Amino acid sequence: MALSSIFGGGSPSQQSNLPTSSASSSVKDQLKGQIAQELAVANATELVNKVTENCFEKCLMAPYTSKQDTCVDQCLAKYMRSWNAISQAYVARIQQASANGDI
């Protein structure tokens, strides 16, 4: 084994196997997309868990009455309004950071 191959001085055909910047950029974009999807799933799961924990525990009691439907509907609507406001603010911050080159 020659020392040149150990220190990166191998033949040009060996060096051409390295990924190009466009290929690594594509991989980076794919990873970003996958991470964004996983975060969206995690956030949706967290929303469902919080709604279940807070709204149903607050509103549903034995014996069941129709007032509980109204309570659950209002509680769910409150969480969805809050979720939408927070999501919009988060997306705006991410877009601003991306435009500034911070991301």
From Swiss-Prot:
Positions with biased composition (Polar residues): 12-25
Role of this protein: Mitochondrial intermembrane chaperone that participates in the import and insertion of some multi-pass transmembrane proteins into the mitochondrial inner membrane. Also required for the transfer of beta-barrel precursors from the TOM complex to the sorting and assembly machinery (SAM complex) of the outer membrane. Acts as a chaperone-like protein that protects the hydrophobic precursors from aggregation and guide them through the mitochondrial intermembrane space.
Recorded domain comment: The twin CX3C motif contains 4 conserved Cys residues that form 2 disulfide bonds in the mitochondrial intermembrane space. However, during the transit of TIM13 from cytoplasm into mitochondrion, the Cys residues probably coordinate zinc, thereby preventing folding and allowing its transfer across mitochondrial outer membrane.
Sequence motif: Twin CX3C motif, positions: 55-75
Subunit structure: Heterohexamer; composed of 3 copies of TIM8 and 3 copies of TIM13, named soluble 70 kDa complex. Associates with the TIM22 complex, whose core is composed of TIM22 and TIM54. Interacts with the transmembrane regions of multi-pass transmembrane proteins in transit.
Predominant cellular place of this UniProt entry's protein: mitochondrion
Transmembrane segments: none
Top-level taxon of the source organism: Eukaryota
Keyword list, A-Z: Chaperone, Disulfide bond, Membrane, Metal-binding, Mitochondrion, Mitochondrion inner membrane, Protein transport, Translocation, Transport, Zinc
One cellular component (GO) term of this entry: mitochondrial intermembrane space protein transporter complex
Gene from which the chain derives: TIM13
Its membrane topology: Peripheral membrane protein
Name used for this protein in its record: Mitochondrial import inner membrane translocase subunit TIM13
Disulfides per UniProt: 55-75, 59-71
MF-aspect GO terms: metal ion binding; protein transporter activity
Region of interest (Disordered), residue spans: 1-25
